[in-house]
């Protein structure tokens, strides 16, 4: 996606799995990048990024902070490197319920239901 479209960076979508490794659903509600999540923010999960080396080096310091830096990083990336896109494919496997503070399958089922109603089942981030 980066090379084909002359982008600075891109991101992939997520498939959600439970703690036992069973497929739950696609993430059509949270890590959507250009499109707001069902709770009204733009978000890309840390493991969904693909960056050109020079971009990663220039913004590496943005990761320093703590919980929530993925949101800060997305803001900086969008501001300073605006040539980006979503691959439109669900190529990242994300496991839920890993610890007591983790989101669970219900989070994605509920969020996906809200987004399905909002977009009438036609999600603009999908390219498959």
Language-model features and meaning:
Residues 15-22, 47, 87-118:
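Active-site donor/metal-binding and catalytic loop motifs
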Residues 29-49:
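A recurrent flexible, glycine/aromatic-enriched loop bordering the glycosyltransferase active site
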Residues 59-65:
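Acceptor-substrate binding/catalytic loop of class I
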Residues 1-16:
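Conserved donor-nucleotide/metal-binding helix-loop-beta segment in metal-dependent transferases, i.e.
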Residues 49-56:
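Conserved beta strand-loop-helix elements of the APE1-like EEP
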Residues 75-93:
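Catalytic donor-sugar/metal-binding loop of nucleotide-sugar-dependent glycosyltransferases
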């Amino acid at each position: 996606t980066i090379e084909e479209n002359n982008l600075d960076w891109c991101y992939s979508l997520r498939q959600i799995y439970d703690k036992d490794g069973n497929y739950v659903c696609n993430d059509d509600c949270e890590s959507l990048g250009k499109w707001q999540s069902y709770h009204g923010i733009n978000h890309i999960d840390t493991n969904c990024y693909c960056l050109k080396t020079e971009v990663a080096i220039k913004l590496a310091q943005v990761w320093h902070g703590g919980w929530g830096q993925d949101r800060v990083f997305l803001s900086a990336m969008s501001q300073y490197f605006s040539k980006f896109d979503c691959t439109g494919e669900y190529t990242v496997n994300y496991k839920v319920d890993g610890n007591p503070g983790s989101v669970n399958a219900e989070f994605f089922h509920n969020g996906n239901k809200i987004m399905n109603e909002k977009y009438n089942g036609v999600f603009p981030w999908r390219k498959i």
